[in-house]
Amino acid sequence: MPSYTVTVATGSQWFAGTDDYIYLSLIGSAGCSEKHLLDKAFYNDFERGAVDSYDVTVDEELGEIYLVKIEKRKYWLHDDWYLKYITLKTPHGDYIEFPCYRWITGEGEIVLRDGRAKLARDDQIHILKQHRRKELEARQKQYRWMEWNPGFPLSIDAKCHKDLPRDIQFDSEKGVDFVLNYSKAMENLFINRFMHMFQSSWHDFADFEKIFVKISNTISERVKNHWQEDLMFGYQFLNGCNPVLIKRCTALPPKLPVTTEMVECSLERQLSLEQEVQEGNIFIVDYELLDGIDANKTDPCTHQFLAAPICLLYKNLANKIVPIAIQLNQTPGESNPIFLPTDSKYDWLLAKIWVRSSDFHVHQTITHLLRTHLVSEVFGIAMYRQLPAVHPLFKLLVAHVRFTIAINTKAREQLICEYGLFDKANATGGGGHVQMVQRAVQDLTYSSLCFPEAIKARGMDSTEDIPFYFYRDDGLLVWEAIQSFTMEVVSIYYENDQVVEEDQELQDFVKDVYVYGMRGKKASGFPKSIKSREKLSEYLTVVIFTASAQHAAVNFGQYDWCSWIPNAPPTMRAPPPTAKGVVTIEQIVDTLPDRGRSCWHLGAVWALSQFQENELFLGMYPEEHFIEKPVKEAMIRFRKNLEAIVSVIAERNKNKKLPYYYLSPDRIPNSVAI
C-alpha cells in the first residue's frame, strides 16, 4: 500500500503548541484517503517550535495530491494550534510543500493547497476552483468592513482585539496593551511620580529636565540643547518625524501679508522677498487643517488651546532652512500679528513653540494615524477579503499587513476612543482628532502615497537646490528597491498586461480599496482597476512602502524629536498671543503642558518609538509562502539592494551630529505593528 511521510511544523510563538487530536486527510486526483490520526506513542506531539514526522499509509494510489485537510479535535481542554507548514513525501520520492502559517482554533479544520502561487486562470480543476471560492467566501464573512467614524476610511468590524479573526491577532495581547505599555514606559523613564500632577506647572525650561532621560550623543539630547535655535527648528521640517509638510512657496498667500521690509534682515542674497520666491528660496508650512478644530475639553480644570499657524521659511546661503515669519492663525489682522526673528526673544520663541505644537498634532493624527495606520488597514482588509492564500499577491503582501489590523483595533479600543489615552495629554483629544481626520481624508490621494510624486508635488525634488533633505534621498532609494522587487514578482506571474486586466481577484482587491477605503471618491485618484504590469507594480509598491518605510519614517523618531516637551508640546494651556512685546518666560512655561500631561506624552512617544521583540525588518520573509525558485531569487536580490542602501546611509551618517537613520532598511519594520 502507498505510504507518505508527513512532516508537520508547529509555530515557535507563545502558546503555539497543542495537546488536541490532529487528523490528516489527503485529497488527490485519483481519490481521497481516510482520516489519519497523527500521533506517536509515548511522544508529546505538536509542541511549540517542533517539527514532527509521521508515516501515513493509504489503501490505494491517490494520484497527484491536490489538497491536505487538517482537523483538530478536543483532547482535554481546547488550545489553539499554530501550524506553520506541512511537507509531504510521496511514494515516488517527490516532496510537496503546503504552507499554512495560520491558527487552527476550537474543533476547527483547515484545507491547504501546495505552495505554488496560482492565478485563478491557472486553476482548471473543479476541486481547486471550489477550494479557492470557498476560502474567499469564508474570509468575506470574517473580514467585514465597518465605519468607525463618519468620513473615515472603513476599518475592520471588531469592537475589541479578541473579536478579530485569530490569524490576525497579536500572539500575546498583553504586549500591545497601550495602558500597560505607557505605564511601563513612565516607570522605565522614572517619571511615574509626576504622572498624576495635572494642573501643576513646571518652574522653567530647566525644570523639564526632571523627566528627561539624559543619554549622551543622541538626537534627543541634541534637541534639548539646541531646540530654541532657528537652524534646529528649520531642520525638523526636512528630517524630523514629520518631514512631509514643507513645500516650496511659488506665490505668497494673501492670508500671510508679509513684506520684504519685515523680513529683510533674514534675507541674505540682496533680493526682495518676491524675488527670493521666484528664485525658489522660500518655503512654506501651512497648518490650515487645524483652523476651527475643537480643542480638548475633557478636563474642566484645564483649558487647552489650538492654533492654525502659517510658517514661512528661507533657504540661506549655507543651503539651510530657517524660519523668517510666523502667523499663528489663518486670518490676518491686528490681533494676529506676524512674528519675526527680529522680535523680542520670547515673542519669537513662543511663536515657534506654537508651530511645533501644531506640527505635533498634524503629525500624530494625519501623517501617522491616517496616512500609514488607517491606509494600511484598508489594504490589509481588502487583501484578506479578495485574494486567496494561493494568489501570488497575497503571498507577497501578507507580511506587510502583519498585525496592522490588530494594532489599529487596540488603538480604537484604548487610545483614540472616547475618553481614551489620547484624551489625557493632547489638545486635539476629546474629538478634535476625529474632526482632523474627517477633513484630511479629502486630501488623501493615491498620488500623495506615491513617494516620488509626493516629493515632486511639494517642489522638494531637487537634490541640488535642497541638499540636506535626507528623508527624500533615503526614501527614494527604498522606493526604487521596493518597486524593482515588485516588478520582478509581477513579471513572474503576469506575462503581459492582458493577464493583469483579466485577473478578477486582483481587480476585486483594488475595487475594495477604492470603494470601502476611499469611500468611492473619484477625486482620491485611487484606481478602480489596474490594466498593466507597470501600474500593478506601482500599486504594490505603494502598499509595501506605506506599511514599511513611510511608517518607519514618521513613527520611530517620535522619542528623538518629541521627548523634550518644549520642542513638541502636545497641548497648550493659554491661547496664542495677540500682540507683540508682552510674552515673558513665565508665560511660556505656564502655556506649556503641566507635569502630568508632560509625563503621559513622554510615556507615549517612548512606547511608540520601540521596536517589537523579534521585529521583522524590510526584506525579511521568514514565513515561506512562496516556494518557487524565481521568486526566492528575487527576494535575495531585494535584500542585497536593501543592504547596499544600509551601507550608503551608514557612510553618509558617519561623524554627523544629527544622523538620519529612520529610512535605513535595517530599521524599517515590514508592517505597521506599533
Curated annotation (Swiss-Prot):
This enzyme catalyses: (5Z,8Z,11Z,14Z)-eicosatetraenoate + O2 = (5S)-hydroperoxy-(6E,8Z,11Z,14Z)-eicosatetraenoate; (5Z,8Z,11Z,14Z)-eicosatetraenoate + O2 = leukotriene A4 + H2O; (5Z,8Z,11Z,14Z)-eicosatetraenoate + O2 = (8S)-hydroperoxy-(5Z,9E,11Z,14Z)-eicosatetraenoate; (5Z,8Z,11Z,14Z)-eicosatetraenoate + O2 = (12S)-hydroperoxy-(5Z,8Z,10E,14Z)-eicosatetraenoate
User: What's its membrane topology?
Assistant: Peripheral membrane protein
Enzyme Commission code(s) on record: 1.13.11.-, 1.13.11.34
Q: Which Gene3D superfamilies match?
A: 3.10.450.60, Lipoxygenase-1, Domain 5, PLAT/LH2 domain
Q: Which domain of life is it from?
A: Eukaryota
Q: Give the binding site residues for Ca(2+) 2.
A: 18-19, 44-45, 47
* Keyword annotations from UniProtKB, A to Z: Calcium, Cytoplasm, Dioxygenase, Hydrolase, Iron, Leukotriene biosynthesis, Lipid metabolism, Membrane, Metal-binding, Nucleus, Oxidoreductase, Phosphoprotein
Positions with a binding annotation for Fe cation: 368, 373, 551, 555, 674
Query: Which is an annotated Pfam family here?
Result: PLAT
Note the effect listed for residue 411 to G: Decreases (5S)-lipoxygenase activity. Forms 9-hydroperoxyicosatetraenoic acid (9-HPETE) as the major arachidonic acid oxygenation product. Loss of arachidonate (5S)-lipoxygenase activity
Record localization: Cytoplasm; Nucleus matrix; Nucleus membrane; Cytoplasm, Perinuclear region
Q: Which tissues is it found in, per the record?
A: Expressed in skin Langerhans cells and their emigrated counterparts in draining lymph nodes. Highly expressed in circulating leukocytes.
Knockout consequences:
Homozygous mice for ALOX5 are also present in the expected ratios. Mice are indistinguishable in growth and size from wild type littermates. Homozygous mice for ALOX5 show no apparent abnormalities up to ten months of age under normal physiological conditions, except that the spleen is usually smaller for 8-week-old mice.
Annotated PLAT domain residues? 2-118
- Where is Ca(2+) 1 annotated to bind? 17, 79-80
**What post-translational modification does the entry describe?**
Serine phosphorylation by MAPKAPK2 is stimulated by arachidonic acid. Phosphorylation on Ser-524 by PKA has an inhibitory effect. Phosphorylation on Ser-272 prevents export from the nucleus. Phosphorylation at Ser-524 is stimulated by 8-bromo-3',5'-cyclic AMP or prostaglandin E2.
Q: Which GO terms describe its molecular function?
A: arachidonate 12(S)-lipoxygenase activity; arachidonate 5-lipoxygenase activity; arachidonate 8(S)-lipoxygenase activity; hydrolase activity; iron ion binding
What family does this belong to? Belongs to the lipoxygenase family.
Q: Extra info from the record? A: Can be converted from pro-inflammatory 5-lipoxygenase to anti-inflammatory 15-lipoxygenase by reducing the volume of the substrate-binding pocket.
Stated role: Catalyzes the oxygenation of arachidonate to 5-hydroperoxyeicosatetraenoate (5-HPETE) followed by the dehydration to 5,6- epoxyeicosatetraenoate (Leukotriene A4/LTA4), the first two steps in the biosynthesis of leukotrienes, which are potent mediators of inflammation. Also catalyzes the oxygenation of arachidonic acid into 8-hydroperoxyicosatetraenoic acid (8-HPETE) and 12-hydroperoxyicosatetraenoic acid (12-HPETE). Displays lipoxin synthase activity being able to convert (15S)-HETE into a conjugate tetraene.
Q: What's the subunit arrangement here?
A: Homodimer. Interacts with ALOX5AP and LTC4S. Interacts with COTL1, the interaction is required for stability and efficient catalytic activity. Interacts with PIK3R1; this interaction bridges ALOX5 with CD40 after CD40 ligation in B cells and leads to the production of reactive oxygen species (ROS). Interacts (via PLAT domain) with DICER1 (via Dicer dsRNA-binding fold domain); this interaction enhances arachidonate 5-lipoxygenase activity and modifies the miRNA precursor processing activity of DICER1.
Q: What is this protein called?
A: Polyunsaturated fatty acid 5-lipoxygenase
- Name of the encoding gene: Alox5
